[in-house]
């Protein structure tokens, strides 16, 4: 049995876990899904995927706090989860994993599973780090941020900020203290660093060498080699792009809006943001003269509607993006890869270092512009949109990048990597030596 623990506060992660679960089922594996809740459990329900709600359950407000905590992770004094929530989460996860005889757990941002997997003594696969992996730091590929994670450091030169972006994550211990305090209580292996919080015993690297700039051979051969920043069993495997392909139709009125191609149309899909930020971005796009289709997801934005602005809820972005001139998205890898796979240039608003990398990879290819959310006033948004629609090089670059992702079944390759890792563990039990945890007391 393979368990999947999506954090359903993230639309991209929920859809990613759903895709992996389906691919595992198609390969004859037994799968169970559990989550601590969130507004996107509806995606699982609408897909007919059974799941168990684990304690403590996160309501919409707690999910908002959690997402905000992810963005500020690493800032002095920030703590993602209180100790009682971590203890309760680990306890319920351990009970679930043992009850179902799970042999492996696949996670996104359900970070308490770093401890529950060790308590149960099973390997953990992680997909939430995307391309934010050690070879990126070691080769200096993490970019200078579009805005510093700490506003007081915005004045630093880009060269210094890039050095910090590559040097810092493996050396930052404070962001994982919220887990390691409980790991010490349980007598299980801690999470050594912020960088390790994006990795698993099997790390599903959801990109391709042509985009990330790290060869397949280098990725597969990478080992911690005693580096204290990483758990000793960490392994990396390219699986290719893995983004949402929600089995939803485009609503009829949105179809009609997209078919009316008299003027360029922009797609605004900023699910991990605030209504105020979405309104600001929409205003900037309108200043640039484009019509706007808004994927509002959980936000109430109907008052924005007029003949040139349409607001819908959750939309199948992989079907919408190929039909628009430009997209405006955050920096999550799912959204970025949807644009890249669609051949659609975009403006990205990265919230944190991993998202900075995602947007930078597209910008390096010539198909995207990054704007730090703190700096994204209406005028900057309008200038970026005008640049993309008036300079054909952006659209041409997007079409070139699209070819890198063509025909790759990321979910299928992720499922194959999970199955292969389990097979290796079964054949070489010593690979789990650091994962044997204590009994939960």
Regions found by a protein language model. Give the residues of each.
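A short, charged/proline- and glycine-enriched loop
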Residues: 1, 200, 261-265
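Active-site-proximal region of nucleotide-activated glycan assembly enzymes
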Residues: 125-213, 219-232
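Generic alpha-helical structural element
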Residues: 164, 168-171, 270, 387, ...
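Donor-nucleotide binding loops and adjacent catalytic segments primarily
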Residues: 207-326
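Generic detection of long, well-ordered alpha-helical segments
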Residues: 83, 87, 168-176, 194, ...
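Short, basic, glycine/proline-bearing loop/turn elements
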Residues: 6, 75-81, 97, 175-179, ...
């Amino acid at each position: 049995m393979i368990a999947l623990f999506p954090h359903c506060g993230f639309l991209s992660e929920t859809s990613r876990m759903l895709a992996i679960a389906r691919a595992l089922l198609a390969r004859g594996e037994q799968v169970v899904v559990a989550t601590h809740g969130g507004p996107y459990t509806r995606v699982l329900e609408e897909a007919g995927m059974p799941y168990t709600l684990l304690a403590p359950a996160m309501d919409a407000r707690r999910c908002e706090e959690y997402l905000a905590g992810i963005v500020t992770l690493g800032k002095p004094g920030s703590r993602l989860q209180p100790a009682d929530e971590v203890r309760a989460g680990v306890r319920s996860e351990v009970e679930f994993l043992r009850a179902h005889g799970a042999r492996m757990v696949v996670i996104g941002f359900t970070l308490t599973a770093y401890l529950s997997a060790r308590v149960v003594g099973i390997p953990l696969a992680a997909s939430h780090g995307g391309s934010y992996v050690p070879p990126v730091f070691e080769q200096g590929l993490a970019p200078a941020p579009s805005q510093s994670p700490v506003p007081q450091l915005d004045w630093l030169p880009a060269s210094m900020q890039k050095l910090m972006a590559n040097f810092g994550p493996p050396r930052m211990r404070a962001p994982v203290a919220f887990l390691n305090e409980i790991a010490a209580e349980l007598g299980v292996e801690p999470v050594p660093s912020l960088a390790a919080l994006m990795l698993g015993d099997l790390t599903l690297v959801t990109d391709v060498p042509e985009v990330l700039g790290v060869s397949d051979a280098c990725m597969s051969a990478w080992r911690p080699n005693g580096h204290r920043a990483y758990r000793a069993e960490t392994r990396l495997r390219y699986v290719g792009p893995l983004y949402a392909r929600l089995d939803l139709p485009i609503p009829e009125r949105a179809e009609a809006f997209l078919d009316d191609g008299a003027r360029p149309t922009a797609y605004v899909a900023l699910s991990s943001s605030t209504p105020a930020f979405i309104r600001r971005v929409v205003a900037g796009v309108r200043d640039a003269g484009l019509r706007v289709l808004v994927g509002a997801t959980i936000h109430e934005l109907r008052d924005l509607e007029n003949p040139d602005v349409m607001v819908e809820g959750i939309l199948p972005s992989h079907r919408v993006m190929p039909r628009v001139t430009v997209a405006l998205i955050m920096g999550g890898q799912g959204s970025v890869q949807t644009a890249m796979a669609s051949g659609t240039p975009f403006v990205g608003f990265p919230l944190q270092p991993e998202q900075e990398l995602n947007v930078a990879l597209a910008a390096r290819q010539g198909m995207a512009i990054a704007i730090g959310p703190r700096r994204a006033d209406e005028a900057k948004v309008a200038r970026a949109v005008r640049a993309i629609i008036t300079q054909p090089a952006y659209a041409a670059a997007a079409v070139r990048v699209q070819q890198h992702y063509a025909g790759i079944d990321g979910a299928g390759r992720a499922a194959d990597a999970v199955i292969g890792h389990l097979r290796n563990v079964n054949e070489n039990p010593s690979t789990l030596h650091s994962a044997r945890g204590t009994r939960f007391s």
